[in-house]
Structure formats: structure tokens, C-alpha cells
Amino acid sequence: MPRSALLCCLILLAGVAASRDQGTQSENSCAHFPASLPHMLRELRAAFGRVKTFFQMKDQLDNMLLTRSLLEDFKGYLGCQALSEMIQFYLEEVMPQAENHGPDIKEHVNSLGEKLKTLRLRLRRCHRFLPCENKSKAVEQVRGVFSKLQEKGVYKAMSEFDIFINYIEAYMTMKMKN
């Protein structure tokens, strides 16, 4: 066998071994994910606690944005998609507007957003927790109401962020039992 062919084979085998080891690391982090979830949810709740009073004081609306139908979607066959869409909704629509309420609020909302991004990244790496494609009607309803509320929608969505964390917890608890 020529040296160049032998060298190519060795490089290929090294690449396959490295790839397999990386897959094992990813699987290991997924194995530990259920144990780290309570800590991640506590961090989300603590980060939200820094802005909760501000947004709940500004929320003058009596109706709920995050309704029971959203929780039912989280618990049903659309749970994965509902969770994915709601994380995207908060990161792309709610939090950018929520950051416009002063430097202190911006800092805390930004921190909350980073923790939510970390959760989303961990969920995506562990495909059994976020393997989805379908659209959730309940999330579409939340988005529609949020848009109609205009500026008040930010106060409403941020004031109910703790409900969103509870829905995440309900979804993840259900997935870990399966």
C-alpha cells in the first residue's frame, strides 16, 4: 500500500474515532441533563425575580396571555413544538422590547435571555427533549394576543414569565418520565 494511501486511512480512522468520542460526550451530557434541569429552572426563576415586580406592576390587564390551552399543548403531542416556539417568542419578540425600559431592566432581561438561550441549546443537543416540527395553535394564539396588546403585551408577557417557567417544568418532567 502506498504511503499516501496509508496516511489517508490513518487520518480517516482518527477522524472517525474523534467523531465517535464527541458523540459520546454529547450523549453523556444528555444523560446528565435531567439532573441539571432543576438547577437551570431555579436560575431562570432567580433571573426573572430581578424584573418580576417591575413588569407585574406595569401589567394592568386582567386577562391571561399564557392560558391553560398553552399548558395543554406543552403536555400533549405538540409539547415539543410549543416549548420551542415559546422560547423563540420570548427571545425574539418579548425580551428585545422588554430591554427598552432602562439600563437596569435591560441588564436583567438580557441575563434572563441568556439563561433561556442556554436552556434552548441544551434541549436541542438532547434530541429526545426537543424533536419537533409541528406548529402549536396555542402559541399562535399567544403571539396574536401579544401583537394586539402592542406595548402592553410586553408587560403582560414578562409579568407571566414565571408561568412560562412552570410550563417548561411540566413539559420536561413529562419527557423525563417517558
Curated annotation (Swiss-Prot):
InterPro entries assigned: 4_helix_cytokine-like_core, IL-10, IL-10/19/20/24/26, IL-10_CS
UniProt key word Secreted: yes
Keywords, ordered alphabetically: Cytokine, Disulfide bond, Glycoprotein, Secreted, Signal
Keyword Signal: yes
Domain of life: Eukaryota
S-S bonds: 30-126, 80-132
Residues with glycosylation annotation: 134
Annotated signal peptide: 1-18
Biological processes per GO annotation: immune response; negative regulation of B cell proliferation; negative regulation of cytokine production involved in immune response; negative regulation of inflammatory response; negative regulation of interleukin-6 production; negative regulation of membrane protein ectodomain proteolysis; positive regulation of B cell apoptotic process; positive regulation of cytokine production
Single Gene Ontology MF annotation: cytokine activity
Compartments where found: Secreted
Major location (coarse): secreted
Quaternary state and interactors: Homodimer. Interacts with IL10RA and IL10RB.
Family: Belongs to the IL-10 family.
Free-text function comment from the UniProt entry: Major immune regulatory cytokine that acts on many cells of the immune system where it has profound anti-inflammatory functions, limiting excessive tissue disruption caused by inflammation. Mechanistically, IL10 binds to its heterotetrameric receptor comprising IL10RA and IL10RB leading to JAK1 and STAT2-mediated phosphorylation of STAT3. In turn, STAT3 translocates to the nucleus where it drives expression of anti-inflammatory mediators.
Protein name, UniProt field: Interleukin-10
Gene field: IL10
